[in-house]
């Protein structure tokens, strides 16, 4: 760059710093790009699939899927992990359906959790913006986008048409929120539901998420949560096998996926993941129905081995570290070749 151009650019940069504050615009070569901070998900596999050890801080996240697929359970685990690291969390319960006892079972410190049950969508998003702008809250969860009903729709008559109101509300709110959460390093997670597209036929997925397209574009990470099997013991259902696909990721390679057990009343089974990934990486030995780690037998059968690890957390922690050391943060879970055509 010649001297005249450089002087003009320096003058423009000084003007921007004076108007908007120092660091408004930086040349990447002048400062090493900082490692993106993250909040753990409570799942070893999903942390690895996300590429940075969890969901990124200072970003908007969307977690979506069918009903009873494990979306709220996953977000409660993320809240618990954030609190363990000393973070402050807020839960915007637009569905008015938060089960406090279940949240406690999952490790959430409900005494320190800030909860709001807004009456309409504008109020919910105003609350999110206000507490995000404070800079004192690390994680905000909104459950769910489908329940963010505009005030005009609530106050109107039953048969009134309110086409596109919710989509416009979300678009307006997200335009404001994106800059705020980045500046304040606050993570905002929107839980969303799926709907069938009207008139969809022939090609592409017939499913879509509620609230218009704005969240798809503004979200740095989008997670698709699906139940893939029911777990049974003596023919009695005891939980679900859940698959999470990272369908969008702006902070690491997308299209990776993770599977884990969600046990009824207990939430995500960390022990089940340790056995699965331990066997996959030859950290845990499997001989017939028996599982063992080093010279210690964990148990006969997967459920017995899970119970052993639950009773011996020091061994579970040792296996966790071995898995993390073996896989690292970059090389983690193999992506699904079938997912390359997804968003």
UniProtKB/Swiss-Prot annotation:
What GO cellular component entries does it have?
Answer: cytosol
Sorted UniProt keywords: ATP-binding, Cytoplasm, DNA damage, DNA recombination, DNA repair, DNA-binding, Nucleotide-binding, SOS response
Q: Where does ATP bind?
A: 65-72
Checking PROSITE patterns in the record gives: RECA_1, RECA_2, RECA_3
**SS bond list:** none
Give the record's family classification. Belongs to the RecA family.
Protein name (record): Protein RecA
